[in-house]
């Protein structure tokens, strides 16, 4: 993909391979099961992964809404977003993720769901994002009204904001049947030490974090811990908000991409993320129907094994 005659570059790549080999060995020792190269989901449908706390299955690719669905009252943009959601469900998608922080994304999702007759496969993932815990219940009720749902499948504490106060309320709501799962989120590598402590001490069902071909810190501790603790993992920023794809698309798609049924860099990037055995679902955001169909293609076909994942990471890091 990228040739460089500099001998120091070659040494750097060797050390990277050695590091990846050690990381792989540590992962195996931790009990993580990597997919076999060429493994195909039953009947050629979308590949799913189990939520450890319940056994429920979710497709490997979901739909985020940060920026892409923040369209205000632009009716044409709302209808365009509805078509994205329609295509998402048609391709086998389930999990849609949003937050009060995301501007008008919540009412945009609600508009789409209403137009589509509230599709039964929907797995609704929302967040509570407010510093005053006393206002949390009102915010969650407003979010449900925007979506047009009676309860959310998953409620997450957004970016750890006031998590000590919000989590007990969410656990109470879950026990009362007012939501199905409880989670917590972070992004861009923030507050990982605190997140790790929460994962070790709180009975959460989900954790959401950033992970992609370049930002891989979570492989060291958080992803192995999630699998050990039975915590489902949602991955945000799988494309680094588009900057990763901008870099990758300057280069020809490598020959090995066909071996994992990828015909685009977006699918390569997503399959790297979702092939990690601790990852439950990645949530790329898009405002284009063609892109949501392409993204959902990463939930079908073969996944990279550990050896190919190492090669993918090394080659992309060298670009």
Model regions and ranges:
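N-terminal secretory signal peptides
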Residues: 1-14
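N-terminal twin-arginine translocation
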Residues: 13-18, 28-48
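Structured C-terminal cap/extension of enzyme domains
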Residues: 26-30, 34, 51, 206, ...
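Conserved, mostly hydrophobic/aromatic
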Residues: 51, 63, 96, 109, ...
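N-terminal small/glycine-rich loop or linker at the start of catalytic domains
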Residues: 54-71
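Active-site mouth loops of central-metabolism enzymes
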Residues: 66-78, 125-133, 259
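Glycine-rich, proline-tolerant flexible connector loops at the mouths of alpha/beta enzymes
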Residues: 97-112
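Glycine/proline-rich, positively charged
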Residues: 131-217, 221, 228-234
């Amino acid at each position: 993909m990228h040739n460089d005659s500099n001998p120091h570059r070659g040494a750097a790549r060797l050390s990277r391979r050695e590091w990846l080999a050690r990381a792989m060995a540590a992962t195996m020792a931790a009990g993580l099961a990597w997919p076999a190269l060429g493994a195909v989901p039953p009947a050629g449908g979308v590949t799913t992964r189990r939520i450890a706390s319940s056994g429920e299955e979710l497709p490997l690719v979901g739909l985020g809404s940060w920026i892409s669905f923040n369209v205000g009252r632009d009716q044409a943009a709302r209808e365009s977003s509805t078509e994205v959601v329609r295509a998402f469900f048609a391709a086998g998608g389930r999990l849609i993720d949003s937050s009060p922080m995301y501007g008008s994304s919540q009412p945009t999702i609600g508009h789409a769901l209403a137009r589509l007759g509230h599709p039964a496969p929907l797995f609704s993932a929302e967040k509570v994002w407010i510093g005053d815990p006393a206002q949390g219940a009102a915010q969650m009720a407003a979010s449900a009204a925007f979506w047009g749902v009676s309860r959310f499948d998953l409620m997450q504490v957004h970016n750890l904001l006031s998590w000590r106060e919000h989590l007990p309320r969410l656990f109470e709501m879950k026990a009362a049947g007012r939501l199905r799962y409880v989670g917590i989120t972070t992004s861009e590598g923030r507050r990982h030490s605190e997140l790790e402590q929460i994962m070790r001490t709180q009975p959460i069902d989900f954790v959401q974090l950033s992970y992609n071909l370049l930002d891989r810190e979570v492989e060291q501790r958080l992803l192995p811990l999630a699998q050990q603790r039975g915590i489902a993992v949602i991955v945000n920023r799988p494309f680094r908000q588009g900057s990763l794809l901008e870099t990758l698309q300057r280069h020809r798609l490598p020959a090995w991409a066909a071996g994992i049924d990828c015909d685009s860099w977006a699918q390569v990037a997503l399959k790297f993320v979702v092939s990690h055995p601790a990852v439950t679902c990645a949530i790329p955001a898009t405002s284009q129907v063609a892109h949501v169909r392409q993204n959902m293609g990463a939930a079908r076909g073969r996944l990279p094994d550990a050896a190919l994942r190492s090669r993918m990471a090394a080659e992309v890091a060298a670009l």
